[in-house]
Amino acid sequence: MSTARFIKCVTVGDGAVGKTCMLISYTSNTFPTDYVPTVFDNFSANVVVDGSTVNLGLWDTAGQEDYNRLRPLSYRGADVFLLAFSLISKASYENIHKKWLPELKHYAPGIPIVLVGTKLDLRDDKQFLKDHPGAASITTAQGEELRKMIGAVRYLECSSKTQQNVKAVFDTAIRVALRPPKAKKKIKPLKTKRSRICFFL
């Protein structure tokens, strides 16, 4: 029996968007009621997706600026990134393009990204939005638009509290890691002897 392939999946995004809650919800089927900044221990377990068994390694990262130097150490060897923003935070949505995409392109170029909108249960919660005037709902269309803009492979929305779509997020990440999209080839001049000869003629 062959050993399961190891897949390293790293969550990235602003602080307090729900990255750690999403990981806890997926691995333990529980939802932490208090905000605790990144206390998720790296997790590894065998998971079956589409008949394939993989050893899924989950890595949590802290979004706060204090961790800007340490965070990229987690990116090494990543097979896929879950790039998360909150569906009730316009700032976290905008930071995907402003902060997180440039960081991932710099430290982990070419690694596929799955874009994830978190806190789905709160997006249509009128009472929550009324009690939090600063909250701004991000629509599915806006999420899909952002996915295209940053070149993410997929876009999903989930709620760690209700567990809606949480498993789908990680199943998608595994599928993407197993079958990464082919990079678009940039057309470069051929560096063959023949092309050099033609060039000088």
From Swiss-Prot:
Question: How is this protein named in the record?
Answer: Rac-like GTP-binding protein ARAC2
**Which residues does this entry mark as bearing Cysteine methyl ester?**
C198
Cysteine disulfide links: none
Motif span (Effector region)? 35-43
One Pfam family from the record: Ras
Q: Per the record, GO CC terms? A: cytoplasm; plasma membrane
Q: What does this protein do?
A: Inactive GDP-bound Rho GTPases reside in the cytosol, are found in a complex with Rho GDP-dissociation inhibitors (Rho GDIs), and are released from the GDI protein in order to translocate to membranes upon activation.
**Stated family:** Belongs to the small GTPase superfamily. Rho family.
